[in-house]
Amino acid sequence: MKIIHIITDLDTGGAEMMLYKLLSSMHDEALNFLVISLMGRGKITEKIEALGVKVEMLDLKQGNRPSWQTINRLRQTVQDFNPNVVQGWMYHGNIAATVAVFLSSPIQRKIRLFWNVRQTLYDSTKEKSQTRWLIILGRWLSFFPCSIIYNSHLSAEQHCNAGYLSKKTKIIPNGFDLQKFKSDKQHYQQFRKELKVSENAILVGHVSRLHPMKDHTTFLRAIERVVSYLSDIGSKKEVIFLLIGHGVTNKLSNNKAIYFLGERSDI
């Protein structure tokens, strides 16, 4: 079986890492994968290529509309690979996958199309204008895929309320390797030395990229309240807040209780 995954880009992110984890866990010789990144190379590209999976880049620039040449290249890439399944990832990838399948087999519809939605939809106005239009377009085209895969019941409910066809809904929660994400005393001690904080300090972590949907504003307000409360009661307890993720910098706050660690791969 030949499967194409189409995704916006391959920089570090939740969807990108889940794509990598999915590919790394499927070692069946009967499966042949191709990944298409609508933009350029990212930090996850080499990890996927190391699995023996080919990655094609369309080199779109962020915010730009695709030219006819780019659309035709996408169509040709899909036709040349001749897949059984095309899987879109997130709004841009879903629409691109839909266009690719339609142009590759407009009559026979021999390619099975699936969408993958990996976020909640509290307030679309906080999304970029292009993304908002793609969300609306996705509502109109939601009859097209065989299934729409969501990673949470809440995400499915919100998108169905926004007009996505509910009968297409499939829910597959995120999976995590508990052998990797487990307590490690040696790493724990080494990490505290790196941060130069005491063994008794309480560490509170927040891991996510900078995006209105992640609501760093509320978390920062909560930090201010905690710090203020500890000061008011004269507590000597040290509480350190670790903010980790792409775009999360000290421009957000000058609170000395906050450590901005940027993007990390050793969570």
Where are these regions (language model features)?
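Membrane-interface segments of envelope glycosyltransferases acting on lipid-linked substrates or membrane lipids
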Residues: 1-267
